[in-house]
């Protein structure tokens, strides 16, 4: 299929063999990438941090023709971590090929892109403008690594191609991703004597009823027709409460997830949650609920006529689209880039047992990234 395929396959084989599940260190992969990039003339800067469990994580910013603190012409951005895999998938860390597909955990999300980015960077010569390769940690558990880069001002570029499995379709906009945990309190008692307690589950039901009403009305007033659906969505995917069938529940907890359209403050739903709480307290002074906002990651909407959008559309042959899942593009935008999400594979097979990337996607992606390097950095 291509002279580049054997080398791409070899690199991807090495990348997937390193278990970079988010709860593990990603240091081996960073060491591997840094060694190869430095051997090709890149200068590398590492940003170390500990995750909530005290596990060491590392972001890598490698530049050819500049420094990590400066602004590159183009950044190729990929996250090094993967979601966990089922123990029954015994070949999860061994790249296997069948019917034109390369199978392994991370092959699609996003080590396939990293392999392509590394090869496009390693083969770049005579650069006239700085090229940057950015590898982040802990994207799968809150975009933590990308947020650390923003805090430190590392990874600045004029244009950024953020790796995700988009089927080689340029994605110029994505919704944000936000989470809040709500705990509603009641009073335990014997279920045979309702007046002896106050049901936290019934109280939570009243809270959720109001939330659903707002999700179906107020949050559908702001529209962005570039998305499907074109409004901010709300979901309550987890709820827990009660101890036994004959005990009035004293507590009920649920998790609210919302995906704001770009331009809408990500805090809007958390403000609505607080409004609901206050209204319920007004109606029932004994009502008690605590709201803990966990994440408020905004979306991004890169201009349709931005140079990087137009280039990727032409180079890939695919019209730009939008997606409703979160990416690291907003963080790259905060660092000053016009960012587009792009990469081999399909998000619908990511995070699954039997995750794969099509061989053809891998080869085409590397070719597009190589063209991007030549276009934005003037190399060959």
Swiss-Prot record:
It holds the Pfam family M20_dimer. The keyword Amino-acid biosynthesis applies. It catalyses: N(2)-acetyl-L-ornithine + H2O = L-ornithine + acetate. Zn(2+) 2 binds at residues 109, 140, 351. Zn(2+) 1 binds at residues 79, 109, 164. The active site is at residues 81, 139. Pathway: Amino-acid biosynthesis; L-arginine biosynthesis; L-ornithine from N(2)-acetyl-L-ornithine (linear): step 1/1. The keyword Metal-binding applies. GO terms for molecular function: acetylornithine deacetylase activity; metal ion binding. Keywords: Amino-acid biosynthesis, Arginine biosynthesis, Cobalt, Cytoplasm, Hydrolase, Metal-binding, Zinc. Its EC number is 3.5.1.16. It is found in: Cytoplasm. GO terms for cellular component: cytoplasm. Its main location: cytoplasm. Gene3D superfamilies: 3.30.70.360, Zn peptidases (3.40.630.10). InterPro entries: AcOrn-deacetyl (IPR010169), ArgE/DapE_CS (IPR001261), Bact_exopeptidase_dim_dom (IPR036264), Peptidase_M20 (IPR002933), Peptidase_M20_dimer (IPR011650), Peptidase_M20A (IPR050072). Its cofactor is Zn(2+); Co(2+); glutathione. Belongs to the peptidase M20A family. ArgE subfamily. This is Acetylornithine deacetylase. It comes from Myxococcus xanthus. The gene is argE.
């Amino acid at each position: 299929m291509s002279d580049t395929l054997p080398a791409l396959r070899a690199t991807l084989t090495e990348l997937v063999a390193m278990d970079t599940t988010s709860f593990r260190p990603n240091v081996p992969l960073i060491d591997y990438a840094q060694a190869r990039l430095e051997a090709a003339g890149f200068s590398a800067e590492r940003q170390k941090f500990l995750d909530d469990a005290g596990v060491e994580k590392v972001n890598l910013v490698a530049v050819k023709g500049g420094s990590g603190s400066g602004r590159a012409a183009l950044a190729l951005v990929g996250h090094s971590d993967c979601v966990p895999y089922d123990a029954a998938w015994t070949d999860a860390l061994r790249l296997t090929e069948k019917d034109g597909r390369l199978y392994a955990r991370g092959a699609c999300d996003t080590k396939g892109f990293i392999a392509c980015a590394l090869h496009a960077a390693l083969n770049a010569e005579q650069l006239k403008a700085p090229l940057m390769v950015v590898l982040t940690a802990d994207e799968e558990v809150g975009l933590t690594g990308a947020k650390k880069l923003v805090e430190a001002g590392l990874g600045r570029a004029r244009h950024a191609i953020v790796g995700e499995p988009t089927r080689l379709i340029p994605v110029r906009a994505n919704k944000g991703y936000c989470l809040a945990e709500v705990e509603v309190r009641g009073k335990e008692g014997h279920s045979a004597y309702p007046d002896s307690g106050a049901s936290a589950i019934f109280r939570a039901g009243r809270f959720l009823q109001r939330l659903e009403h707002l999700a179906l009305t107020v949050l559908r007033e702001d529209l962005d027709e570039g998305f499907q659906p074109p409004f901010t969505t709300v979901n309550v995917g987890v709820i827990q409460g009660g101890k036994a069938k004959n005990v009035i529940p004293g507590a009920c907890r649920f998790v609210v997830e919302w995906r704001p359209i770009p331009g809408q403050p990500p805090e809007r739903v958390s403000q609505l949650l607080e409004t609901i709480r206050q209204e319920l307290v007004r109606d029932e002074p004994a009502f008690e609920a605590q709201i803990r906002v966990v994440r408020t990651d905004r979306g991004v909407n890169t201009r349709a006529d931005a140079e990087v959008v137009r280039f990727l559309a032409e180079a890939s042959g695919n019209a730009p689209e939008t997606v409703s899942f979160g990416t690291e593009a907003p963080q790259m935008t905060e660092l000053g880039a016009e960012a587009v999400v792009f990469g081999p594979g399909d998000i619908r097979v990511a995070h699954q047992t039997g995750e794969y990337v099509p061989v053809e996607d891998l080869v085409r992606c590397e070719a597009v990234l190589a063209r991007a390097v030549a276009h934005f950095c003037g190399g060959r």
